[in-house]
């Protein structure tokens, strides 16, 4: 689908004072606002901060659940956007509303699983909920910004789920939730520069938008660095204890033996009280700086994390699509005092590099990434740009690779995400069968875990990370999920231990904060 219609937009950009502490900025501007988002990034080697994006407030919230996409205007600015997109969406699905000016929903038809891959990509789908808005403002010299979450379970709308029933675990997460930015702060930490951008979609709202920009600039003169902390229990519970989880690993090994899959990623969930979400994110960020760090303040949940792994990245200037598979891990080499022992750390890296099981698992997933890239990229452009490097984080080290290709001209980044979700490092291979088996054995939704957080702009840029090393917080409880890459010769207890190692950094950060106030 190609939507060329233009709509009014006025964008202003003004320099603002640089502050390194983005958590304090978010606390000052957004802590009382739902529908706000903080994206931070750090360099893998040096751990130095690179860039940050703060979606201070939004004009429209776009939420998907099943085959229904809901568009909610959050103010008068957003109402104009709904007015613009409504007629375009009526051509794509069944539209319903009590008051079309404030909120409406679009029901898309389920895709026929008998269609070939290209026909599925060219059909109207729930991704058009985002595509319509992005396309409407593609003429804007300063691109609009859509930031948010694709849940893991979004994929259930696109794969056969016959005979699969999932238990209600009491957690509610939309299939996707995105915000159309009204005010966006961009921070370049390397050059110590910051800019406040405002996006006005309704001509009559320009004065109000300017007033809000002035108010934001004034608040930045008195940044609140103090995060309120409440005492809470540091007790951690899990949905599968070690015997239960190793039992799942053993049962899945049967499916590897009979050839259903040759690699799969079972997971389990660790839960604990988390009344101090922003402070926990700040602690995690301090303990474990990562390429992708995020704090999403939704009306219905809070999601924060420090992910090492890109989900899908797209640059329109050269049409390069990129997947960054991470598979194979070892704990960091700590001494008896909890400090990194360089010699032990180096030995563990060598052990990781020489482990045949880890090599096999990693190469399977590199091959799966190559297949995903090939599905949507031009023939002959796919290549493995980096192979089996080692990235280090606070508690764990990983084998990583980078696979790239040139996206076909008739497709965009949302088509690519539809074709590639969910990332193979969180599912296994063959991917569809692995995802079906995961649902059968875990028997519940994964919610945010294994999905993607990031952003889409109207000029086509798309940058997302896999939601791992993260906490989904709802009703005061944080849910931290972690998986393991299982192959034929996997040791069940080692796989259970791997999930604990992967969850450790987030659990530690939350527990540190919970006990600070005691």
From Swiss-Prot:
The keyword Magnesium applies. Keywords: Amino-acid biosynthesis, Aromatic amino acid biosynthesis, Lyase, Magnesium, Metal-binding, Tryptophan biosynthesis. InterPro entries: ADC_synthase, Anth_synth_I-like, Anth_synth_I_N, Anth_synth_I_TrpE, Chorismate_C. Chorismate binds at residues 328-329, 449, 469, 483-485. Its EC number is 4.1.3.27. It holds the Pfam family Chorismate_bind. Its cofactor is Mg(2+). Pathway: Amino-acid biosynthesis; L-tryptophan biosynthesis; L-tryptophan from chorismate: step 1/5. Feedback inhibited by tryptophan. The keyword Metal-binding applies. GO terms for molecular function: anthranilate synthase activity; metal ion binding. Disulfide bonds: none annotated. Binds 1 Mg(2+) ion per subunit. L-tryptophan binds at residues 41, 291-293. It is an enzyme of class 4 (lyase). This is Anthranilate synthase component 1. The gene is trpE.
